[in-house]
Amino acid sequence: MTTIAFLGTGLMGTGFIQRARANGLTVRAWNRSAAKAQALAGNDAGVTACATVAEAVRGAERIHLSLSDDASVDAVLEPLAGALPAGAWVVDHTTTAVRPTAERVARWTARGVRCVHAPVFMAPANCAEGTGWMLISGDPARHQALQPALQLMTGSLVYLGPQPERAAAFKLFGNLTLLGILGVLGDVGRLAAAVGIDMKDAFSLFEHFNPGQTLPQRAKRISSGQYTPPSFEMSMARKDLRLMEEEAARGGQTLAMVPALAKLLDEGIARGEGQLDVAAGVRVPGA
């Protein structure tokens, strides 16, 4: 029976361990707060709670991590330098920054350890069920070797190319989008409060209108650089943002996301781009 180590037994780590057990793996688990790993072991004889990281990785075919950030990953892994056998697998599911991820993979590769970054778009329930999306990048041979095992952990395994840091970048792209949506919903709630409409009532709009369906089209418009003919003129979009800010102010509310977008459109209009599609206002200069 295959044994893996799992370092970090928070909500996602716990879900991943449950999935590993459902897939017939035995797990050696470690967590900085030992009680969490001990609770998992107490409910499942196939999980061993280990007091130290070194104990957890001993005899494991793969070492998986689900921690909080780059600093926590390095704090856990670096003491293992020189202790892991050549050819050991380290699979990091932590959301980390792009450059530190590239440096970490290079550092461990130089030590003879096969280190791969595989962040996820998976809630704890997805981790337990093996659904959602897992990203992976780096050496194609490593991807091919890991694919059967990682595919059992997720609904879709997405390979993003040979640069080891690409998965980290794409995870940040996705989380930026998700968090940006939350910011927009916050502004919708503030605008609703300003005009005397209950937030739940305002959000009922999205039972009929799904603005997310326009996201691929809008992204393509921005990246293509084709801003004519416009589907939504920048000057008209800026007018709508003005209406939103004015209504919010009348109701004693201040919008959070709208002012930043308004600033970008003001800059575009100042460049004489008011008749172009609004996508021109958010493009990256020189990109």
Which residues does each predicted region cover?
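Hydrophobic beta-strand scaffold residues
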Residues: 27, 49, 115-116, 157, ...
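Rossmann-fold NAD(P) dinucleotide-binding segment
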Residues: 53-114
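NAD(P)+-binding Rossmann beta1-loop-alpha1 motif at the extreme N-terminus of oxidoreductases
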Residues: 1-65, 88, 124, 156
